[in-house]
Amino acid sequence: MSSDLGKKVREIREAEGLGRQAFCDLINVPKQTLINVETGRSSPSGKLLAEVSKCFSKYTLWLMTDQADESCGQISPEIEKARQTLKQTGTDTD
């Protein structure tokens, strides 16, 4: 489970287009802690998960349950990446 959460944290960071240091600055954790979590060397702490959820609240449901509900603003990194691709190609519907 912890490696799954670490992978999810990494997916969120990448979907937001952030490098590790920028992400760490936002969630107030040391870079080495993030590296250890993302690579599965350590489990994410409750504090880290809370900070990720606070800073990137649109991913909270997905982070904890593997589900997304766009109707209430809860998405997955996959949805965010698709949105970014649509914006870049000019095919978004907004």
Specify the residue positions occupied by each region the protein language model found.
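Residue-level detection of the helix-turn-helix DNA-binding "recognition helix"
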Residues: 14, 28, 39-41, 68
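DNA major-groove recognition helix of helix-turn-helix/homeodomain DNA-binding modules
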Residues: 47-62
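Short alpha-helical DNA-recognition segment
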Residues: 17-36
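Short, charged recognition helix plus adjacent turn
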Residues: 64-94
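K/E-rich alpha-helical interaction surfaces of small helical-bundle regulatory domains
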Residues: 22-24, 58-67
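A short, Lys/Arg-rich alpha-helix, primarily the initiator
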Residues: 1-16, 26, 89-93
